[in-house]
């Protein structure tokens, strides 16, 4: 019996400085041929020098696929205008890296780590790769702790987890970005923490407004900003969240700080991944999204976590396409969240800000074992009253409020006061309302809503509860309307 001897062919992966040449350009997708046996590894950054409109520029390409025959398919992180076949491409030998350290605070960077407000700044800093492994199971923090925000509706009904992942869901124009700006202000002013903001595929104007506003309220010095706005190629929009997360990881792991990571908007991360997937020729999955949607989302979300004594708390704005929560993009995000704050168009239409829907929002730590028995009891009573009010809406619309029982009439009046008391004057809206933002301690919030649910404020006019802070504000406004608490 004869035996056939098989031999393995070893392929030497690319090393730093190896040069190839462009053989195909299709929008942001660039195919590059390398010498035999010197193929760059996946996620390696390649540099291509080109000229467009008499200006020389260097493009950064990221290896996405090995096609065989010494060809790699890459995604460009800059516009490929002027790039032609035959252009020399150099393998850097490393993946994309960004500057880290205390020096990144107070500055704006792009996905590649280049400083936008001060060109050349940060080049000498230590750089970390944006592709990193999440902390091991042994490093994770087992303790669960509440993050106090000073916003009544959040602290009472959807308490945030320190080191958790929090999402702001909502359609277009209901206040997701404003609420994120509010949280940056509150964390910097009240807690002195470090914030990292990732602008993923949103409007350039919003980024500029945020930059100016953070300067005005003197919190820019504690915030690092990383932008990849909606006019950028999909490769940039897909990587900018990882760049910001890498900066946040340095503050957690090396500086032992609690960090807040803001991502606006996580849907654009998914959208960019879908565009890249299509460009790479992958078969689309449900509703046209990429087949690797859950994997890509998991790679990002698993790195956002608490290690022992240190945390990254993430707030992510999630655009909901056509207000459809069954869309795969928001649905995939749900699986990773500790708290959800849903911003509702119907609440927004009532002029209640922040426009949080208290019945649709939720938190995994609204549990008596974590927030305490009293907090849990008051929150459940508020939810019960608001749910009953919602159930009565059809009867009120058809027959009128006079047809309700005396008990239900009392409950409706109480629910309307609760709805208005859940609104609050915000720091981010001071220039529009002329009112300074207010911060309400959790204990005061619980006490105020407990008394409200028991009917102690039934005699106070509804408008006294609108856009105010705590009990002191309520007392002043009630007295101005001729009522006493």
From Swiss-Prot:
Residues 1-20 are annotated as: Disordered. It is a peripheral membrane protein. The keyword Nucleotidyltransferase does not apply. It catalyses: ATP + H2O + 4 H(+)(in) = ADP + phosphate + 5 H(+)(out). PROSITE patterns: ATPASE_ALPHA_BETA (PS00152). CDD domains: ATP-synt_F1_beta_C, ATP-synt_F1_beta_N, F1-ATPase_beta_CD. ATP binds at residues 170-177. GO terms for molecular function: ATP binding; ATP hydrolysis activity; proton-transporting ATP synthase activity, rotational mechanism. Its EC number is 7.1.2.2. GO terms for cellular component: plasma membrane; proton-transporting ATP synthase complex. Belongs to the ATPase alpha/beta chains family. NCBIfam families: atpD. Produces ATP from ADP in the presence of a proton gradient across the membrane. The catalytic sites are hosted primarily by the beta subunits. F-type ATPases have 2 components, CF(1) - the catalytic core - and CF(0) - the membrane proton channel. CF(1) has five subunits: alpha(3), beta(3), gamma(1), delta(1), epsilon(1). CF(0) has three main subunits: a(1), b(2) and c(9-12). The alpha and beta chains form an alternating ring which encloses part of the gamma chain. CF(1) is attached to CF(0) by a central stalk formed by the gamma and epsilon chains, while a peripheral stalk is formed by the delta and b chains. This is ATP synthase subunit beta. It comes from Mycobacterium leprae (strain TN).
């Amino acid at each position: 019996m004869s035996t056939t001897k098989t031999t393995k062919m070893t392929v030497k992966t690319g090393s730093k400085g190896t040069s190839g040449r462009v053989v195909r350009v299709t929008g942001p997708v660039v195919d590059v041929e390398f010498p035999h046996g010197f193929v760059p590894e996946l996620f390696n950054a390649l540099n291509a020098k080109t000229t467009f409109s008499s200006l020389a520029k260097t493009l950064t390409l990221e290896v996405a696929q090995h096609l065989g025959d010494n060809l790699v398919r890459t995604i460009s992180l800059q516009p490929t205008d002027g790039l032609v076949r035959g252009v020399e491409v150099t393998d850097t030998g490393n993946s994309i890296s960004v500057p880290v350290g205390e020096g990144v605070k107070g500055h704006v960077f792009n996905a590649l780590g280049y400083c936008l407000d001060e060109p050349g700044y940060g080049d000498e800093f230590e750089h970390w790769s944006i592709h990193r492994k999440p902390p091991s199971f042994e490093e994770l923090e087992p303790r669960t702790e509440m993050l106090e925000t000073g916003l009544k509706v959040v602290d009472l009904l959807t308490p945030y987890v320190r080191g958790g992942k929090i999402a702001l869901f909502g359609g277009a124009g209901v206040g997701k970005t404003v609420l994120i700006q509010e949280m940056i202000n509150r964390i910097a002013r009240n807690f002195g923490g470090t914030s990292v903001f990732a602008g993923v595929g949103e409007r350039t104007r919003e980024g500029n407004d945020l930059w100016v506003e953070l300067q005005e309220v003197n919190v820019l010095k504690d915030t690092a900003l990383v932008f990849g706005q909606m006019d950028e190629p999909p490769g940039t929009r897909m990587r900018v969240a990882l760049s910001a997360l890498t900066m946040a990881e340095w503050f957690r792991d090396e500086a032992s700080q609690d960090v807040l990571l803001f991502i606006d908007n996580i849907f654009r991360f998914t959208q960019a991944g879908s565009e890249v997937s299509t460009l790479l020729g992958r078969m689309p999955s449900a509703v046209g999204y990429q087949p690797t949607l859950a994997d890509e989302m998991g790679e990002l979300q698993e790195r956002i976590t608490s290690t022992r004594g240190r945390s990254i708390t993430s707030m992510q704005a999630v655009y909901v396409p056509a207000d459809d929560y069954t869309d795969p993009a928001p649905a995939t995000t749900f699986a990773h969240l500790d708290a959800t704050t849903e911003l509702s168009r119907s609440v927004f239409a009532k002029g209640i800000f922040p426009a949080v829907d208290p019945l649709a929002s939720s938190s995994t730590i609204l549990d008596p074992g974590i927030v305490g028995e009293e907090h849990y009891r008051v929150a459940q009573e508020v939810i019960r009253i608001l749910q009953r009010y919602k159930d009565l809406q059809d009867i009120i619309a058809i027959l009128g409020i006079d047809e309700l029982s005396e008990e239900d009439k009392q409950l409706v009046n109480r629910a309307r006061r609760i709805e208005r008391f859940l609104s609050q004057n915000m720091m981010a809206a001071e220039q529009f309302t002329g009112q300074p933002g207010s911060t309400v301690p959790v204990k005061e919030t619980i006490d105020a809503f407990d008394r409200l649910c028991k009917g102690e404020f039934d005699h106070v006019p509804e408008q006294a509860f609108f856009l105010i802070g705590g009990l002191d504000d309520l007392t002043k406004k009630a007295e101005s309307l001729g009522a006493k608490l």
